[in-house]
């Protein structure tokens, strides 16, 4: 199984890259992961609602193009309105995917959200939190949760649960 993280934006602050890299390094023996950075749409200083929709559309097309390159993979989209999963539920979903031989593309949208087209094609809509999280922090939290879930699946002591 391979998980590709399709994320809008690049040039993350050093603390984000350091945190992400730590969990990315730790997870590799358990799960192959790859990061695909998608350029954010160029934004106006005071964008209108129409501009915001255009940014989501442009980024959405790039997300779907990156997803299409891989062939057969499930599309999981991080969305505030998505289903919340416990770490144990995530571990189960990843385990099921591994048994079925499914690859996963996990989408972190841009600052203005994800296009309706991407949401419509999503196999899973997942909310990390009811809180609004900054996109750079989502990268770190996502990778840590993937690592924690895989630790559960491999009986690694990292996750001690409740």
Curated annotation (Swiss-Prot):
It is found in: Cytoplasm. Signal peptide: none annotated. It comes from the Bacteria. S-adenosyl-L-methionine binds at residues 78, 109, 128-133. Its EC number is 2.1.1.177. Keywords: Cytoplasm, Methyltransferase, rRNA processing, S-adenosyl-L-methionine, Transferase. Homodimer. Specifically methylates the pseudouridine at position 1915 (m3Psi1915) in 23S rRNA. This is Ribosomal RNA large subunit methyltransferase H. It comes from Psychrobacter cryohalolentis (strain ATCC BAA-1226 / DSM 17306 / VKM B-2378 / K5). The lineage of its organism: Bacteria, Pseudomonadati, Pseudomonadota, Gammaproteobacteria, Moraxellales.
